[in-house]
Amino acid sequence: MTTQQVGPQSGTLKVNTYREGVAQKLGHDLVIEVEQWDATVDVGPDGAIQSVQLNADPSSLRVREGHNGAKALTDKDLKDIHTSIDEKVLGGKPIAFASTAVEPRDDGVTVRGELTMAHTTRPATFDIDVSGDGRVAGTLPVTQSEWDIKPYKAFMGTLKVRDTVEIVLDVQLSAD
């Protein structure tokens, strides 16, 4: 078995959020990049992923794209979103994932484990696609309220961030 360290130097970790509500045209669907994160991936002799451990710094989440809003996001909007995510949503607490089981499937693996964020640890399962060149990609849907996170809302609740967001991982494993 070999152990590989991955992080921003080998790929991306992003969070996709979506807006809803009668005033959703005033908000934006966001692509938020996690700038500081690291993961340890254990790979078996056959090249199959055996385990995954990931840690992310909640203060390093930065909005990279805002789609479908009535107007472009301003620098103040971006700063306010960053502050809200770090202080109100995640409480400045580290984000971590530790696999408990990895099961093979066509074109990849299903990873089961424990996701910790905002003071809460819960089971999480997602599929990872693995290409022949070592590219690893997966999306984990997360229902914020299951981690005791209250989705953002404004304008007396007429603009909200949808309760389910997506954590998207896309990395290149080395050919070792």
Predicted regions and their residues:
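Low-complexity, acidic/polar, glycine-enriched regions of mature
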Residues: M1-D176
